[in-house]
Design a protein with these regions (language model features):
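N-terminal export leaders
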Residues: 3-7
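Bacterial signal peptide processing site
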Residues: 22-26
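Extracytoplasmic "Venus flytrap"
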Residues: 44-71, 76-92, 100, 106-110, ...
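Short, solvent-exposed amphipathic alpha-helices that sit
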Residues: 56-70, 151-155, 179-199, 213, ...
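Hydrophobic alpha-helical segments within soluble ligand-binding/sensing domains
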Residues: 88, 143-169, 213-215, 262-266, ...
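Hydrophobic alpha-helical
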Residues: 105-121, 188, 203, 207-269
Length: 343
């Protein structure tokens, strides 16, 4: 698509979908002026979560929009209402037609999305993944919130601590196809086999990234496994869902609850002693870093083979051999520290 046609299309988009960066060029254009000949091209970056209604990704979007305020870019934001790999592919196809400069996407299905992303690359569009990766040949860089090994081992070690290294536990995940969560589960199970012979993983249930379904699945698990000592929830809606199930069953404290989630969604359960630990990273920083990497790639500041990238307020971060930029180590939120955080 020609740039002039693309810009006319963007002008017609709803304001909720197009978030312009604040800069003099934009002001001139809004006043009826035009970009001066020879001025740098303004990048359009398309940003897609796994699902728009998930509080985790709402906070990712918040961080992305913070980066927009620092960068001379336009941001397109869209994604499925619920986790839907087919819808992600459809949105990518639309962005290919629009001719965006960079696509940044959290992949629901690692292999299922790779074809659409490869097509984007063939059309000259740069691709960055974040939170959950695709196949390496379908993107340039992956913005990783933490290593899969670090997350999986951290969850398993915390569950073992809470259960005094013995007893049955169950996992609630988002879907059985989520590539990042499958990676975490692999390391959870490896750590279990390596270090905790008196603990047993009895079941793994998907909740489709829905709190209500997570609550129902946790209720079912409590009924099916009367000796259950811990529910480990590895997607953000599942943590409060599992906590509510344990609370309503009158098993707070007897059945431990931990998982990956937002402190804001779990504060009450932590302070009541229903949930013992919430593990996460600073989610807004993940969205912020993703936009910084996408901008660096689209502008040419970041190239294949680079070992570091400048990431605004986060400073310079390392890039590993798998072309992954690591945000940092996970953090454990407890009733003692949860009030220090507002996301």
């Amino acid at each position: 698509m020609k740039r002039s046609h693309f810009l006319r299309f963007l002008t017609a988009l709803p304001a909720a979908l197009l978030v312009p960066g604040c800069n003099k060029t934009e002001t001139d254009q809004e006043a009826g002026g035009s970009t001066a000949p020879g001025s740098p091209k303004k990048l359009t970056i398309a940003f897609m979560p796994k699902s728009k209604g998930n509080s985790y990704f709402i906070n990712c979007e918040k961080g992305a929009r913070e980066a927009v305020q620092e960068l001379d870019i336009d941001l397109l934001f869209d994604g499925p209402t619920n986790t839907d790999p087919a819808k992600q592919n459809e949105i990518i196809e639309n962005w290919i037609t629009l001719g965006v400069d960079v696509i940044a996407v959290a992949c629901e299905n690692k292999e299922g999305i790779s074809g659409a992303l490869k097509k984007a690359i063939e059309k000259g569009i740069q691709v960055v993944t974040f939170d959950s990766d695709t196949t390496p040949d379908a993107r340039s860089f992956f913005v990783n919130q933490a290593t899969g090994q670090g997350i999986g081992e951290g969850l398993m070690d915390e569950a073992a601590r809470l259960c005094e290294e013995e007893g049955e536990f169950a996992i609630i995940t988002a879907t059985l196809t989520a590539s990042n969560m499958n990676e975490w589960r692999k390391h959870i199970e490896a750590r279990l086999a390596e270090k905790y012979p008196r603990m047993k993983l009895v079941d793994t249930k998907p909740c489709d990234d829905q709190k209500d379904k997570a609550q129902q699945e946790a209720t079912n698990l409590l009924g099916a496994y009367p000796n259950l000592k811990c529910v480990m929830a590895i997607c953000s809606p599942a943590v409060p869902g599992a906590a509510e199930a344990v609370k309503q069953a009158g098993k707070a404290g007897a059945v431990k609850v931990l998982g990956l989630g937002l402190p804001s969604e779990n504060r009450a359960y932590l302070k009541e002693g229903v949930t013992q630990s919430v593990i996460l990273w600073k989610v807004t920083e993940l969205g912020y870093l993703t936009l910084q990497v996408a901008h660096a790639l689209g502008s040419g500041a970041l190239k294949a083979g680079d070992t570091h990238v400048k990431a605004g307020r986060l400073g310079e971060l390392a890039i590993d051999a798998n072309r992954a930029v690591l945000l940092g180590k996970p953090f454990v939120f407890t009733k003692e520290n949860v009030d220090q955080f507002d996301f």
